Swiss-Prot record:
Keyword Zinc among record annotations: no
Organism: Dictyostelium discoideum
Subunit field text: Occurs in many kinds of cells as a complex with monomeric actin in a 1:1 ratio. Interacts with forH.
Name assigned to this protein: Profilin-2
Cellular component GO terms held in the UniProt record: actin cytoskeleton; cell cortex; extracellular matrix
Length: 124
């Protein structure tokens, strides 16, 4: 499966409004949904350097700042209005998935974390 297929099938297909996969090493964009431009790749990779990193800065994705509600070396979750963002680091990439009011925060986290587990289990 291509990286774009993970975005299209596993994230957008599960109800996320927009999503991207970034390289964990440098924050480069590997795949993204149409019109979703994640220019903050380096800043997103920095969120996973130490527990709590996102609490000081918030989570900046596609020009929006999300208030951090979880931040550790694997996952960073943020809220903005009725929606939010879930970022999860695997061995090689970072899942960045934005949801709106059509997807509950717990469901959003569960979907992204399960995809991350699958990728990790497959050495990705």
């Amino acid at each position: 499966m291509t990286w774009q297929a993970y975005v299209d099938n596993n994230l957008l297909g599960a109800g996320f409004a927009s999503a991207a996969l970034l390289g964990a090493a440098d924050g480069s964009v590997w795949a993204h949904s149409a019109g979703f431009n994640v220019a903050e790749g380096k800043a997103i990779t920095a969120l996973f350097q130490k527990d709590g990193a996102a609490f000081a800065t918030g989570i900046h994705v596609a020009g929006k700042k999300y208030m951090a509600i979880k931040s550790d070396t694997r996952s960073a979750y943020g809220k903005l209005g009725a929606g939010g963002v879930v970022c999860v680091k695997t061995l090689t990439c970072i899942i960045v998935a934005v949801y709106d009011d059509k997807l509950q925060p717990g469901a959003a986290a569960n979907i992204a974390e399960k995809l991350a587990d699958y990728l990790i289990d497959n050495n990705c």
